[in-house]
Amino acid sequence: MNHTPILNKKNLIWIDLEMTGLNLENDRIIEIATVITDKYVKILAEGPSIAIFQSEEQLKKMNSWNIFTHTKNGLIDRVRKSKYNEKNAMIDTLKFISSWVPFGKSPICGSSINHDRLFLSKYMPDLEKYFHYRCLDVSVIKELARRWKPKILSKLKKKHTHKALDDIKDSIKELLFYKDTFIKLN
């Protein structure tokens, strides 16, 4: 991994959010992470992985799956102790990505990324605006593989930690897996 930022319009910004739930009107972001890759999806740098403070009232609104998952992975404890709010997390994330990719050049990259984009639009609008309007969504390829070549999916191994940085790395590995087994680029 390169630790010296090199601004390149072909670099890709990968992002993942963990939220208290999926309802845009009632739920909030509790973690954000970013990774920069080159155009061949080689990881160049990992951005900050930031737990975002939310009140106990907000945390109590989570459903049982979220409570279980984010207690098990330690995120709820990190959220309770965090000094970050959404604005500070957005500023630090923008500082990181802007040293690697110019404004408006990278699609938003990840898995099921449109839902994350909705939360960014509401809670971190300056960050959402930084991305190109297009997206690179690994879930689209997964859905095609599920329909056209389902046997390959049994070979795909993911961590499923529901930690933002781990989820990004899983998405990158998944895309590379599809490149080798499904898309088969030479």
From Swiss-Prot:
<keyword id="KW-0269">Exonuclease</keyword>
<dbReference type="InterPro" id="IPR022894">
    <property type="entry name" value="Oligoribonuclease"/>
</dbReference>
<keyword id="KW-0378">Hydrolase</keyword>
<keyword id="KW-0963">Cytoplasm</keyword>
<feature type="domain" description="Exonuclease">
    <location>
        <begin position="12"/>
        <end position="175"/>
    </location>
</feature>
<protein>
    <recommendedName>
        <fullName>Oligoribonuclease</fullName>
        <ecNumber>3.1.15.-</ecNumber>
    </recommendedName>
</protein>
<dbReference type="InterPro" id="IPR036397">
    <property type="entry name" value="RNaseH_sf"/>
</dbReference>
<dbReference type="InterPro" id="IPR012337">
    <property type="entry name" value="RNaseH-like_sf"/>
</dbReference>
<dbReference type="Pfam" id="PF00929">
    <property type="entry name" value="RNase_T"/>
</dbReference>
<dbReference type="InterPro" id="IPR013520">
    <property type="entry name" value="Exonuclease_RNaseT/DNA_pol3"/>
</dbReference>
<dbReference type="GO" id="GO:0006259">
    <property type="term" value="P:DNA metabolic process"/>
</dbReference>
<feature type="active site">
    <location>
        <position position="133"/>
    </location>
</feature>
<comment type="similarity">
    <text>Belongs to the oligoribonuclease family.</text>
</comment>
<dbReference type="GO" id="GO:0003676">
    <property type="term" value="F:nucleic acid binding"/>
</dbReference>
<comment type="function">
    <text>3'-to-5' exoribonuclease specific for small oligoribonucleotides.</text>
</comment>
<dbReference type="GO" id="GO:0000175">
    <property type="term" value="F:3'-5'-RNA exonuclease activity"/>
</dbReference>
<keyword id="KW-0540">Nuclease</keyword>
<dbReference type="GO" id="GO:0005737">
    <property type="term" value="C:cytoplasm"/>
</dbReference>
